[in-house]
Amino acid sequence: MSLNLGSLGMEDASFDFGGSYIMALDCGTTSVLATIVDEYGCIVAQARRSVKTSFPRPGWVEQDPMAVLASQIAVMMEVQFKSGIHSDRIAAIGISNQRETTVVWDRVSGQPIYNAIVWQCRRTAPAIDALVEQGCEELVRSRTGLTLDPYFSASKVQWILDNVDGARESAAAGDLMFGTIDTWLIYNLTGGQVFATDYTNASRTALFNIHTLDWDDDLLALFDVPRSMMPEVRWSSGDYGRVASDIMTNMPPIMGVAGDQQASLFGHCCFRPGQTKNTYGTGCFMLMNTGDEIVESKNGLVSTIGIAADGKVSYALEGSIFAAGSTMNWLRNNMSIISSVSESAQLAASISDNEGCYFVPAFAGLGAPWWDPHARGIVCGLTGASSRATIVRAACESMAYQSYDVLRAMEQDVGLSIERLSVDGGASRNEFIMQFQADLLDIPVLQCETVETTAIGAAYLAGLAVGYWEDLEELEQNAQIVRTFLPHMSAERREQNLAGWRDAVRRSLSTAQ
């Protein structure tokens, strides 16, 4: 098959897809990844580097945008070297990224004026509280589908403009640019030629109207962000320019962009309303495809754009859980309870039950469905017989309990029962957690062949745009489930466990402090 790239607004050329591949870039919270994917949706090669995160004050989370960019380019080079597949055999590039994380940079120099403020950062909680007290919550929710929370980008941009010397004046003069991580990467990978984001990332800023599909002037005014700072919004599967020749000699086109969780939804082939996936990464992120319907949640979830491709926008319900895999990192790095994350499954399974111990990992408050930025992490139910295994098991179980709360909220919002859950992310390889998840939900949990479904989704978006894959049906044929976890827990024990969890959450909420 060949494609005339001129039809995509690119230079006249034809591309023979024989022996070619798609490259996916996944710029996550803890690492950046470059993946080469073949026509069957299989991973041929990968390169990964960790991303350094700083915590300058309690509740503050930052990353160096230049270091993130350098690491992303480095893995692009490394995966070509490892695989022997170079830029002349890359048909297109897709990008997925940690969402909400905010970068502001100078339009002339291209240099960031401050570190990237990461999605987990809670520094803007006082400003958000003030907006809630002013009655702004309904405006934000009705326009964006989101709740007022420090999680989203709007208050982060506002903080940078208010706290960096000269930023307000530069913004007023049109000299500053704002972007989530995808925009920052696209701008730099194209040598400053393309300043754009996609609909999924835009929908996570709390500045984008998901009904009109445009930046919302009322919200820009509410957060005091000039419209001149905002990137162009494009389809998730479409043209984002070519990679600069000093980065990749043959300048492959960037043809797919999506926030990591939407890319994961696409990678799972959740193309139909009601299909649901959960990613167990730094946090847990559960998304349900709701088709062309924007479901207004009454149960603490957010409505967001699920994917925007082929001239059509599909929406999703989402529940964002702030602490999942990061809880395991906390046990290892902060408490030295485990020496490696892989040790957690064995320890958790070494005891027959949780011994009445519950762990609520509200290190950055609680996300869906509670949305309490002031909740505090707790471990409760300890006795003199409690051990290291007790705490590790409670931490593992916390991912499943939080996911249970989100899934039940989804079912209430849409008025139907979810029959199965597709899973990915690093913790989805923890057999203890996946079995406990199936037991709690009382439905099958489907484990994919690869944990890197986010990268697969980004590759699919790029490949569809250039005709590497024909249609969604071809992608569905690529989907491979390697294991299904079936529920075994009795209803009585399930309810006993959930009652203990609900009590633990109640104790962690700010209303109990």
Language-model regions: role of each:
Residues 31, 99, 230, 302, ...:
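Short glycine-rich loop/turn motifs
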